[in-house]
Amino acid sequence: MLRWMTAGESHGPALVAVLEGMVAGVEVTTADIAAELERRKLGFGRSPRMNFEADELEIIGGVRHGRTQGGPVAVRIANTEWPKWEQVMAADPVDPDVLASLARNEPLTRPRPGHADLAGMQKYGFEESRPVLERASARETAARVAVGTVARHFLRQLLGVEILSHVVSLGGVSAESDHLPGPDDLKAIDDNPVRAFGDAATERMMAEVDAAKKDGDTLGGVVEVIAYGLPPGIGSHVHWDRKLDARLAGALMSIQAIKGVEIGEGFANAHRRGSAAHDEIYPAEGERWVRRGSNRAGGLEGGITNGEPLVVRAAKKPISSLPRALATVDVVTGEPAQAMHQRSDITAVPRAAVVAETMVALVLAEAVLEKFGGDSLPETRRNVEGYLAGLRERAEKRQVR
């Protein structure tokens, strides 16, 4: 069973992530994780924090000489600004007079609409929102990306799976493409200022961001994640919690500010007749023995992969920390107030796409291990080869008939 957890606050000393259940023998290095953390910083409309957050990381367990050892993989990512926050965010008690003298420790009593601020204060009985926003911050996703890199390398080394993402809409601007990007397109996407596939809509997306910044506003958007190389049979139709589409949706919805998930052309299919919604099946030569005329299902049927590329989309709402503050209530005085503004991005949609890749990788790695088992990469690979050999054998028998 693959499990993972993160800990740490946005302005604490560090973030920590632990991945348990990964097989031994997966090749991964500090440099591999650092490269993915750099990708997480990509995108037009970033906050100044992205420019100075160094993401200094250390693998503190589970990897030796560039290979996983079968034990929990633990990663620590230092927060660059910790020295400025050492007293405000200290784990041990600090002299109240010292805290009172610190501007950074001013109570945050004007919760932001759309943020976890108020609901978290009500749930945990806090008098201000600092304890909520520190953990609710999307800074936490850096820890997810760290352990997700291990999952991504496992999938690539076991099955040749490649996962990529791109921005399909930003604010009111949609990217213009009539086909999916492939693994060879990833570098071009990462080099694009808004991580769009193709340049047709890039300038309009950037203009949308600039306009929002000028107005003191923020933007949301939609990202798409595609996984190539998955064999049929990952996931299950048998139980609700084993359905791969359900697990993917839950994982993507766990990303900060994600408010909707679509598998394949799910929402468009809701407006079509069945004859125009489903992917017809045709005979084909070779080990797959069938082919699809389309991939509107996004590679999943009945909660199981069907051999087509896996395609999922996630909708991200606009960031809730706006320079043009929204109306709120001061929780101390009970009087109307303007919501506080923390330093934030104008849009985090391009970065959210990279985080979405991470969540897809973690879910797929767990499902693949459930399907094939094993304690080491070579053992799991043998199990995969046996399964694929069985698929080929059945395909050959059908073709002989």
Curated annotation (Swiss-Prot):
GO BP of this protein: amino acid biosynthetic process; aromatic amino acid family biosynthetic process; chorismate biosynthetic process
Residues reported in the UniProt entry to bind NADP(+): 40, 46
Residues binding FMN: 135-137, 256-257, 302, 317-321, 343
Tree of life domain: Bacteria
GO function terms (MF aspect): chorismate synthase activity; FMN binding
Cofactor(s), by name: FMNH2
Xref: PROSITE patterns: CHORISMATE_SYNTHASE_1, CHORISMATE_SYNTHASE_2
Subunit structure: Homotetramer.
Entry function: This reaction introduces a second double bond into the aromatic ring system.
Similarity comment: Belongs to the chorismate synthase family.
Official protein name in the record: Chorismate synthase
Gene assigned in the entry: aroC
